[in-house]
Amino acid sequence: MHTLFIVLLIIDCIALITVVLLQEGKSNGLSGAISGGAEQLFGKQKQRGVDLFLHRLTIILAVIFFLIMIGISYFGL
């Protein structure tokens, strides 16, 4: 049981890191904050397609991560 939780945790961590790295950046960095940052503030657009899928998958994988960690600590593994 302990090995199963650890393997699931490792798979979830690798998937979570991969999904986060696949997402596009939401800001232009420091240059976007200094000049032209208001465009993002007022021109906020809804996510569509792949961006929306990656965003939702990130949330799902994060919830699974925390559930596995709670399971490991609850069962004292």
UniProtKB/Swiss-Prot annotation:
The gene is secG. The keyword Transmembrane helix applies. The lineage of its organism: Bacteria, Bacillati, Bacillota, Bacilli, Bacillales. Belongs to the SecG family. It comes from Staphylococcus haemolyticus (strain JCSC1435). GO terms for biological process: intracellular protein transmembrane transport; protein secretion; protein transport by the Sec complex. GO terms for molecular function: protein-transporting ATPase activity. It comes from the Bacteria. The chain crosses the membrane at residues 2-22, 57-77. This is Probable protein-export membrane protein SecG. Involved in protein export. Participates in an early event of protein translocation.
